[in-house]
Amino acid sequence: NISLGSSATAVSTLLGTKVNITTPIVQVMTKEDFDFQDLEPAVGVEISYVKGLSGKSVMLFSRNDVRVIVSMMMGAEIPEEEFVMDEINASAIREAMNQMMGASATALSEFLGTTVDISTPISYEIDDGNAFKDKYFDGSEDSVVIRFTLEIEGKLSSEFINIMSVDLVKRLLEPFKAQFGI
């Protein structure tokens, strides 16, 4: 939540309007239990932590939410029936996520007391939900699934999902353990 507050500020600046990302709902899930049909058709955005942390963070957005964000960035409404995830739109959503996750990494750096750097985001449409789950849910390992409400003033009230490995989340929680003796 600390890092996503910074993310909301970064996206607000990019879009020129108020953006709110609500308190997360966190669940540890198996591949079999994970479902994202409410976001389909969905767009995935993956970043890798390249310094300070190890692992991937994957965000899932509905295709329509991506359309709204890209439209705002481009300054022109893109009708739903005309929106395609071509290179221009994919680049725009990567830039939005780069701003969002870059701000998140900066907040994490301060929180963890170490520099946290991320890779350039990779964005893609999810054509096969099972292949997506096979890629991001490592065998029988559980993953941490975090749902957020995304509100863009006057434009959007929706959800997005963040998926991380249990190991990555444990690393993120280490400062709490130290501070509270957990």
Name what the model sees in each region.
Residues 1-181:
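Composition-driven recognition of glycine/serine/threonine/acidic- and proline-rich low-complexity segments
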